[in-house]
């Protein structure tokens, strides 16, 4: 079997990095980098219209719950084909935007940087598609002492298939790495 490399597509964007509070001078809290993966949706069974703001995602909130600070080191949206993708191709519109953008899943292709991807069919039947987050166009801090309004948000739209399907053609997820620091002092819970 041939090893297939993911198709990596870079989103065109306007360089407009978010601003954040500068760290205090002197010694900083130790930090660690941890991986994460969030399942967004299966595609090809019904219409998908999704908005995932990383700073308020429940999976990431659980991962960062015992830390005061969390920032994105790297992140990507990934489209994985499933076993039915060669016979039932599906398309998905994707864009990374700051969370205070007025863009919505239905306006992805009217927004600068919006992309349409086809998963399945004769050309991309077994290809994984990677869509990296451009950290120079959003604020990478998803948890801090203050709330930021420009943290990353992924918009996704995939129409319902023309014929009813029971098995998804593809899956969409977000994965990457977070830098966590400034541990919160919490009580130790004991089991009863």
Curated annotation (Swiss-Prot):
Its main location: virion. Residues 1-30 are annotated as: Disordered. Keywords: Capsid protein, T=3 icosahedral capsid protein, Virion. Residues 12-30 have a biased composition (Polar residues). It holds the Pfam family Tymo_coat. Disulfide bonds: none annotated. One of its GO terms (cellular component) is T=3 icosahedral viral capsid. GO terms for molecular function: structural molecule activity. It comes from the Viruses. It is found in: Virion. Belongs to the tymoviruses capsid protein family. Self-assembles to form a T=3 icosahedral capsid composed of 180 copies of the capsid protein. The capsid encapsulates the single-stranded RNA genome. This is Capsid protein. It comes from Ononis yellow mosaic virus. The lineage of its organism: Viruses, Riboviria, Orthornavirae, Kitrinoviricota, Alsuviricetes.
